[in-house]
């Protein structure tokens, strides 16, 4: 009798995706982040579901309901902090996953890469709306400032902002719709993740060398299932260290003050994972220019396949490109730091230089380096 996992219509899908899937024999720990993102998503949906059972999406009671969850609900505090810090872990894994894709040239799988970029935008939208829900000072002012950026769009901008707000300011209607979107988007993300996997399994995984590994494949189970379990344990360990020892490390103290439209916090800033884009936004004095740069800072990922000039796929054997890649990483860390600082000298000029550096590295220096490396190969 044939094994049920190979014949049953549902089990067959699982089998072909996670058990008998042919995988390259040389993929490193950088290939663990896909499964870690899946775990993060499941964790966020589960903790979010339990939080939604006690949360009220109303300006009068939202802040109190979060306090109630932390104080009165059984293990509510741990669910709340797992959800908040789970978002940070999600973005750490996302940045590592995207960075891996850039380094090893995974963007040459066009469909997989483009679905991935859509996933990144969807996750950023979800995280932004989630940050508004506790209705603290930074929730309210963050929502006001970020949504207000859309007013920079010519002609339709102001109407668009008022349409999103459901009125003339961020108020009850805004909070209710943000909660609705924050609840539905993770399920859309889950569906997109399946499409992402579907496209990936059409081509098979990339590997550190960037060379076809068709002649050297191994089954996903047990080799990579056990490797993914180790990654998952390390992820959960890191998350629980954050939750149990320093739950507010990555949060903002201003969010423990209830939202007050009459009192603006001294430094309005988003969560840490948006600071790089926020720094790019602030580095341009013009409002529309800043918004365009903000969107382009992430949308530039779509251009990566077009900017790939090298004859080799991966950066494994390209030392000049490697140097530029790590300079880009350092530049992004600099932007993240600047995004959290007040808008004053010397932070303004550092932010402007880091922003110029960011776009120059991706659009000019990396393609030029690839061309130089191609010529060096001829020698």
Curated annotation (Swiss-Prot):
<keyword id="KW-0479">Metal-binding</keyword>
<dbReference type="InterPro" id="IPR048260">
    <property type="entry name" value="Cytochrome_b_C_euk/bac"/>
</dbReference>
<feature type="transmembrane region" description="Helical">
    <location>
        <begin position="320"/>
        <end position="340"/>
    </location>
</feature>
<dbReference type="InterPro" id="IPR036150">
    <property type="entry name" value="Cyt_b/b6_C_sf"/>
</dbReference>
<dbReference type="GO" id="GO:0005743">
    <property type="term" value="C:mitochondrial inner membrane"/>
</dbReference>
<feature type="binding site" description="axial binding residue">
    <location>
        <position position="196"/>
    </location>
    <ligand>
        <name>heme b b566</name>
    </ligand>
</feature>
<keyword id="KW-1133">Transmembrane helix</keyword>
<feature type="transmembrane region" description="Helical">
    <location>
        <begin position="178"/>
        <end position="198"/>
    </location>
</feature>
<dbReference type="GO" id="GO:0008121">
    <property type="term" value="F:ubiquinol-cytochrome-c reductase activity"/>
</dbReference>
<dbReference type="InterPro" id="IPR048259">
    <property type="entry name" value="Cytochrome_b_N_euk/bac"/>
</dbReference>
<keyword id="KW-0999">Mitochondrion inner membrane</keyword>
<feature type="binding site" description="axial binding residue">
    <location>
        <position position="83"/>
    </location>
    <ligand>
        <name>heme b b562</name>
    </ligand>
</feature>
<dbReference type="InterPro" id="IPR027387">
    <property type="entry name" value="Cytb/b6-like_sf"/>
</dbReference>
<keyword id="KW-0812">Transmembrane</keyword>
<dbReference type="InterPro" id="IPR005798">
    <property type="entry name" value="Cyt_b/b6_C"/>
</dbReference>
<keyword id="KW-0349">Heme</keyword>
<dbReference type="InterPro" id="IPR030689">
    <property type="entry name" value="Cytochrome_b"/>
</dbReference>
<feature type="transmembrane region" description="Helical">
    <location>
        <begin position="288"/>
        <end position="308"/>
    </location>
</feature>
<feature type="transmembrane region" description="Helical">
    <location>
        <begin position="77"/>
        <end position="98"/>
    </location>
</feature>
<keyword id="KW-0679">Respiratory chain</keyword>
<keyword id="KW-0472">Membrane</keyword>
<feature type="transmembrane region" description="Helical">
    <location>
        <begin position="226"/>
        <end position="246"/>
    </location>
</feature>
<dbReference type="Pfam" id="PF00033">
    <property type="entry name" value="Cytochrome_B"/>
</dbReference>
<dbReference type="Pfam" id="PF00032">
    <property type="entry name" value="Cytochrom_B_C"/>
</dbReference>
<protein>
    <recommendedName>
        <fullName>Cytochrome b</fullName>
    </recommendedName>
</protein>
<dbReference type="GO" id="GO:0006122">
    <property type="term" value="P:mitochondrial electron transport, ubiquinol to cytochrome c"/>
</dbReference>
<dbReference type="GO" id="GO:0046872">
    <property type="term" value="F:metal ion binding"/>
</dbReference>
<feature type="transmembrane region" description="Helical">
    <location>
        <begin position="113"/>
        <end position="133"/>
    </location>
</feature>
<comment type="subunit">
    <text>The cytochrome bc1 complex contains 11 subunits: 3 respiratory subunits (MT-CYB, CYC1 and UQCRFS1), 2 core proteins (UQCRC1 and UQCRC2) and 6 low-molecular weight proteins (UQCRH/QCR6, UQCRB/QCR7, UQCRQ/QCR8, UQCR10/QCR9, UQCR11/QCR10 and a cleavage product of UQCRFS1). This cytochrome bc1 complex then forms a dimer.</text>
</comment>
<feature type="transmembrane region" description="Helical">
    <location>
        <begin position="33"/>
        <end position="53"/>
    </location>
</feature>
<feature type="binding site">
    <location>
        <position position="201"/>
    </location>
    <ligand>
        <name>a ubiquinone</name>
    </ligand>
</feature>
<keyword id="KW-0830">Ubiquinone</keyword>
<feature type="transmembrane region" description="Helical">
    <location>
        <begin position="347"/>
        <end position="367"/>
    </location>
</feature>
<comment type="function">
    <text>Component of the ubiquinol-cytochrome c reductase complex (complex III or cytochrome b-c1 complex) that is part of the mitochondrial respiratory chain. The b-c1 complex mediates electron transfer from ubiquinol to cytochrome c. Contributes to the generation of a proton gradient across the mitochondrial membrane that is then used for ATP synthesis.</text>
</comment>
<feature type="binding site" description="axial binding residue">
    <location>
        <position position="182"/>
    </location>
    <ligand>
        <name>heme b b562</name>
    </ligand>
</feature>
<comment type="similarity">
    <text>Belongs to the cytochrome b family.</text>
</comment>
<dbReference type="InterPro" id="IPR005797">
    <property type="entry name" value="Cyt_b/b6_N"/>
</dbReference>
<dbReference type="GO" id="GO:0045275">
    <property type="term" value="C:respiratory chain complex III"/>
</dbReference>
<keyword id="KW-0813">Transport</keyword>
<keyword id="KW-0249">Electron transport</keyword>
<feature type="binding site" description="axial binding residue">
    <location>
        <position position="97"/>
    </location>
    <ligand>
        <name>heme b b566</name>
    </ligand>
</feature>
<keyword id="KW-0408">Iron</keyword>
